Amino acid sequence: MDPNGKVALITGGARIGQVVAGALANRGCSLSLTYRDSRDAAEKTAGAARATGVKATVLRADATDETEIAAAVRETVKSLGRLDILINMAAVYQKTPNPDGVHWSAIQDANAKSAFLYSIHSAPIMKQNGSGRIVNFSDWLPVTGRPQYKDYVPYYVSKASVAALTEALALQLAPEILVNAIAPGPILAPPNLTPEENAQVLEATPLARWGGAEEIAKTVLFFVETDFVTGEFIRVDGGRHLS
């Protein structure tokens, strides 16, 4: 699919999402950006996209609320005329040493259920267009096969769910819609990372650096532009899964 003249809905457009949005806008793709709390960041991203000559709209939507998700999809089509690409980036990364049902539901809803709901509400529109692309975000660990860190049970399972969802949707929505997933590793260093923790990450990563958001944007563009890859995962982790 050529992104030029198409419309992409991006959920969770902060940080890495800003770079992904910019990459699509530079290819001539108009944008619908959803946010829950970070309106200023979403507006800034939309403004940068408009400066490239494409259209961009900003919508508030709780990624765990089906009514708001459905409304965001409808408003995207109403404002921009179509919907061709869905980038499911909204996510919660939370450490839970003593998880309970509240943790489980909140993290599963934000990470897996949201991707499912956005996909099922977007798919009929894409099928009417004759083609579509859905790009989900899992994590390098569940895609690799085994957990390596304690205290992340709900998060790990939610991202494993996204991986399973990707394969199931790829089969269900073929041949018109291609569904794939990115499994990021060390992309952006957390702001509170200590020098010791940073050194540990670099030592465990064969490429010995943080990837940067641009690497995610490149992979998103690949999944958008390919015409014969679906149900696939790409680990963008600098080889972290090898160590």
Functional labels for PLM-detected ranges:
Residues 2-32:
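Canonical Rossmann dinucleotide-binding motif of NAD(H)/NADP(H)-dependent dehydrogenases/reductases
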Residues 70, 91-106, 128, 146-154, ...:
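Conserved mid-core segment of classical short-chain dehydrogenase/reductases
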Residues 213-236, 241:
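C-terminal substrate-recognition "lid" of short-chain dehydrogenase/reductases
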Residues 29-43:
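Conserved glycine-rich Rossmann-like NAD(P)H-binding loop of the short-chain dehydrogenase/reductase
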Residues 100-117, 135, 155-158, 162, ...:
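Catalytic Tyr-X3-Lys loop
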Residues 74, 110-128, 142, 170-175, ...:
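Amphipathic alpha-helical dimer-interface segment in Rossmann-like NAD(P)H-dependent oxidoreductases
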Residues 174-178, 230-231:
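Short, small/polar-rich loop/turn modules that mediate ligand/substrate recognition or access, typified
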Residues 92-96, 133-161, 166-174, 186:
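Catalytic loop of short-chain dehydrogenase/reductase
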